[in-house]
């Protein structure tokens, strides 16, 4: 019970102190907001504005009293005393009105301050928006300027590249033209060289042909002349051989004997020596040629008494001009055949046959060698 009383006493004291603080604060605030009319000319005319004048001395005394009460209350708390319930003082109507007026003024001031702060915020927001707009415009201008600079740079680069491409194209065309001209020059030089070579070759061929034709003509003429001379010589030789044959036939024999010994004459004999050339009709030219062959060879036949009673048969091969192409032993003793073969080898050539017919008949005659 006593504890409850002590708590109630403490609460009442705390409320009293709080009210005193509020009152003291209101007094100070009222002294800040009072107005004093300045009377003009000392006449005392004009409207009178009510004001509350606070005596600072009284306020100080009140403040000292409150402090004493707080100190006394603290002392009471240190030494417990019986708690006496105090009846709270009745509120003063004037103070209440004054307090309400102060509250109204504070609310008005708060609203004005709030309005001022809102206006400041509005102005700040407007300034911020204007700054943002300016910044945006500056950035847009900067971006536009950068874009224009980039465009100018791109245009300049494009122009530079176009000029470089054009220059490269012109250089390429010039280079191509130079290469084409060089190629044309080389082709012309090569063509001229080929034409010159062809012309020189044609001239050389024509010259060679002319020389060849001249040589051929000269050779043909020389051959014709040689043929004519050879023919004339052959004819002369034939005539000479024929004359010799005629002379031989007019005064010689065939087979190595005389007419009285069985040799044939141009007027007719009946017997001749040798197997192939030793017999025949004495009135035929072929037999006469056979006698000429035998006489021509036997002129070189060296006779020896030891050959008596011996016969050597030799077969010879003649060319158309009477050249002895070859010979061989058919039969006979070695001693007489050796002399016969030696005679044939030394003869080498006999008069040519007067005709092809006689040559075909006597181109391989067999001659008998003996010492009769």
From Swiss-Prot:
One cellular component term from this protein's GO annotations in UniProt: plasma membrane
A molecular-function term among this protein's GO annotations: toxin transmembrane transporter activity
The consequence of residue 306 to S is:
In strain: 1479
Matching entries from SUPFAM superfamilies are given as: TolA/TonB C-terminal domain
Q: Name one GO biological process term.
A: cell division
Official protein name in the record = Tol-Pal system protein TolA
Parts of the chain on the Cytoplasmic side: 1-8
The entry's localization annotation reads:
Cell inner membrane
Tell me the organism's taxonomic lineage: Bacteria, Pseudomonadati, Pseudomonadota, Gammaproteobacteria, Pasteurellales
Give the organism, scientific name: Haemophilus influenzae (strain ATCC 51907 / DSM 11121 / KW20 / Rd)
Q: Provide the residue span(s) of the region labelled Disordered.
A: 64-139, 166-217, 256-281
């Amino acid at each position: 019970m006593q504890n409850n009383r002590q708590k109630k006493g403490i609460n009442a004291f705390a409320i009293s102190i709080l009210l005193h603080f509020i009152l003291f604060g209101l007094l100070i605030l009222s002294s800040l907001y009072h107005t004093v009319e300045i009377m003009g000319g000392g006449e005392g005319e004009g409207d009178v504005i009510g004001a509350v004048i606070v005596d600072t001395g009284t306020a100080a005394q009140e403040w000292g009293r409150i402090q004493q009460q707080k100190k006394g209350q603290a002392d009471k708390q240190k030494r417990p005393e019986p708690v006496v319930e105090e009846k709270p003082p009745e509120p003063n109507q004037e103070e209440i009105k004054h307090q309400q007026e102060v509250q109204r003024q504070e609310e008005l001031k708060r609203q004005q301050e709030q309005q001022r702060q809102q206006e400041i915020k509005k102005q700040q927001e407007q300034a911020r928006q204007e700054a943002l707009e300016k910044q945006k415009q500056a950035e847009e201008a900067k971006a536009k300027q950068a874009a224009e600079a980039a465009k100018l740079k791109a245009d300049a680069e494009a122009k530079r590249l176009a000029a470089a491409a054009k220059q490269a194209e012109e250089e390429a065309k010039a280079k191509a033209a130079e290469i084409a001209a060089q190629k044309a020059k080389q082709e012309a030089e090569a063509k001229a060289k080929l034409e010159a070579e062809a012309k020189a070759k044609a001239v050389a061929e024509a010259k060679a042909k002319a020389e060849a034709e001249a040589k051929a003509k000269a050779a043909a003429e020389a051959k014709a002349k040689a043929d004519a001379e050879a023919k004339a010589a052959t004819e002369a030789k034939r005539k000479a051989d024929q004359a010799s044959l005629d002379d031989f036939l007019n005064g010689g024999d065939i087979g190595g004997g005389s007419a009285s010994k069985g040799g044939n004459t141009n007027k007719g004999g009946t017997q001749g020596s040798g197997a192939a050339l030793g017999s025949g009709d004495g009135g035929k030219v072929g037999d006469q040629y056979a006698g000429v062959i035998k006489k021509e060879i036997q002129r070189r036949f060296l006779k020896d008494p030891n050959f008596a009673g011996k016969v050597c048969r030799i077969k010879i091969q003649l060319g158309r001009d009477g050249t002895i192409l070859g010979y061989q032993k058919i039969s006979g003793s070695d001693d007489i055949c050796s002399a016969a073969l030696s005679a044939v080898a030394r003869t080498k050539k006999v008069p040519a046959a007067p005709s092809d017919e006689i040559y075909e008949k006597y181109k391989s005659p067999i001659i008998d060698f003996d010492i009769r």
